Regions:
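Conserved helix-turn-beta segment immediately C-terminal to the redox Cys motif
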Residues: 84-103
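Short active-site neighborhood of thiol/selenol oxidoreductases, capturing the structured segment around
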Residues: 61-76
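Sec/Tat signal peptide C-region and signal peptidase I cleavage site
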Residues: 24-27
Length: 180
């Protein structure tokens, strides 16, 4: 093989790796668009009936009169772990009387979900979807996924992927939940 062909072959093998690396770096620096997808969500609102790590069973009446974010996550999911601090920040900012953020752990033992919450300082209620039933009922296939309900209990948005909930666009989505 001549030198020219070898150089072209090496370059063609190297370019995809460089493109992936550059894309990751640009995303980390905030130079690309969001790593999430927002779609309208109209329900249906399946039964909730999930236990949290304290033993409380959560039902729809527990959520009435406030906006709600149902965040499906798992401790093995890197984007889930990355967005969790910003979920805690918006929950702290608005308070549970106005915005209730429920972190719904997907198919992990309660001890693992509780350990994650303790080591990360997470104070959100952590609900346990140990069988994946709730995720299945609501069509959750990507982690993290957040389902948003307005303060009248109406389903509004489905967000797939990692979100910085303290940034402008997600903040507008949250504010829109109080306008109902």
């Amino acid at each position: 093989m001549d030198l020219n062909r070898r150089n072209v072959l090496q370059a063609s093998l190297l370019l995809p790796a460089l493109a992936v690396s550059a894309g990751r770096q640009a995303r980390a620096q905030g130079l690309t668009g969001p790593a999430y997808e927002v779609t309208p969500w109209s329900g249906p609102l399946s039964s909730l009936g999930l236990l949290d790590t304290t033993g409380k069973t959560w039902q729809w009446p527990d959520l009435q009169g406030r906006a709600v974010m149902l965040n499906f996550w798992a401790s093995w999911c890197e984007p889930c772990r990355a967005e969790m601090p910003t979920l805690q920040q918006v929950a702290d900012l608005y308070g549970a009387d106005k915005l209730l953020v429920l972190a719904i752990n997907f198919k992990e033992p309660a001890a693992r979900a509780l350990q994650f919450a303790k080591t990360t300082g997470l104070k959100l209620p952590v609900l346990l979807d140990t069988t994946g039933r709730a995720a299945g009922q609501w069509g959750v296939k990507v982690f993290p996924t957040t389902l948003m309900l307005d303060n009248r209990g109406q389903a509004r948005h489905r967000i797939k992927g990692e979100v910085d909930w303290t940034s402008n666009a997600p903040g507008k989505l949250i504010e829109g939940l109080f306008q109902a």
